[in-house]
Amino acid sequence: MSKKVAIESTAEAYLELLAARGIEYLFANAGTDFAPLIEAYAKRFATGQALPRPITVPHEVPAVAMAHGFAMVTGRPQAVMVHVIVGAANATGGLINAARAGVPMLFTAGRNPITEAGFRGSRNRPIHWAQESFDQGALVREFVKWDYELRNFSQLETVVDRALAVSAAEPQGPVYLTLPREVLGEAHDVFEYADTPRAPRPADAVAAPEAVQEAARILAAARRPLVITKAAGRDPGAVPALVALAEALGAPVVDQFHTHVNFPQDNALHGGFDASPYLDEADAVLVVESDVPWFPALKSARPDARLVHVAVDPLFTRYPVRGFAADVALPGAPRLTLAALAAALRGAVPASVAAERRERVAAAGRERRSAAEARARALGQDQPIDMAWLSRCIGDVLDPRTIVVNEYDLDASQTCFTTPGTYFAAPSSGGLGWGLGAALGAKLAAPGHTVICCVGDGAYIFGAPTAAHWVSRAYEAPVLWIVFNNRVWNAVKRSVLSHAPDGWAKRTGMPLTELDPPPDYELICQASGGHAEKVEDPTKLPAALARALDIVRRERRQVLLNVMCKKP
């Protein structure tokens, strides 16, 4: 069935269609290209039409990260709009993050007015000449699944429905739609559209049965099977399927470079966060949604190990170079493929063998977790604060209704995440500044949950904190921000030491890595009405965390803890 609504412009029809297609938020960093859209919003507000809710985000980095954070929690794409090509340039790092993380997103930007006169949206500012580009889509084309320019009111429904369908199809990712001001500003009286989009969205697929059986034979025949995963938990439904598979095999599951809760940490078969100790023995390795299961330059699977890869795109076809071998590659939705594999393995491994393996993994896990806790508690008096102790203190206050967004510094070995969808780490694409906006998006997606954002001081600066704290206050999205302040870009420092272990930089100092003297980050949060504390005494850290969580939950106000950590 179709629906017919009275409108005044293409912009109004566009907002009507986004709302009808389930877009709840438009995260926006506005410019002169927004004029028709803002006028359309004003009319919709006056007539009681609130969706998609516009969120003003005063910097493109948190704007894109907010859409990313909302989608990673809910699985539902949201819309972002930035100011023509200059806004898209500022947003590109976030788009790369979304692309590599497989996050659906309708990314849009205004299109500089094409005409110099004669139309309602024609050029009337100096920037409208200087901002014109020959091919605006070229800026981000490599990192979006599809890009297009809306050229005519009559194609609005087709274009938007196709954009959303392409974004949601696996492997998911952002799409880019440019919106010329003249087209948005065109006057129209009526917009008619289908109640339900008919753009094809492919159903989730499962790998071919014969390929699943071959993979099952490889795993069942192994004496030391191993599972490595990075992002199986992107689909929470894949987690119980992975648990069933691991239990059928009695195989350890390693969260290598993990970005999600992929496997409950309290399960006896959780194998920790480093696959290296297992690779020498493993004669079959199941790699699940992992672009980089190990570093070939440092440690690889045995040459004779049989390798099975499971992912929506097991070849990671958008990566120019990726040379990880596979005997069987199983494309499709991991929850379906893993469930099929678990069913094929049922009874294939004797129960006594699986139980013996399970006990061996469990014993190693108990020892590993005990050692991690002992290490953290032994460092609990150190000042400046050790990150292991900070991570342990955070782990002690977590519950299933708390979501953690981690941009690098939280040590997961000091925590115990068991519920899918409660932990998200920065994409390995490394577009810094992701954490602040992603945490805000997560809070909008799950308003009944507590959201904690763990972020390094360098990443905090990249995240446009003035903008992020303002958004938190303006839209009542309280987050507990924890800055792991070690006053250095440690990833850069580690890279230098890896490149030249005994070189000049180690002996004489490292330019381009220092963040000393540190700003008083707590003042940035306070400027937007938040509570903030600098924490220097490790013995006062648990009380500071308890105080912070009470304020976030009871007062619904953001809190920042600037934790002074050891400088490496």
Predicted features and spans:
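Phosphate/pyrophosphate-binding active-site segments
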Residues: 1-5, 154, 304-408, 520, ...
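N-terminal alpha/beta PP-like core and its mobile active-site loop of ThDP/TPP-dependent enzymes
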Residues: 2-345, 349, 397, 469, ...
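Active-site diphosphate/adenylate-binding microenvironment
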Residues: 11-22, 32-42, 362-448
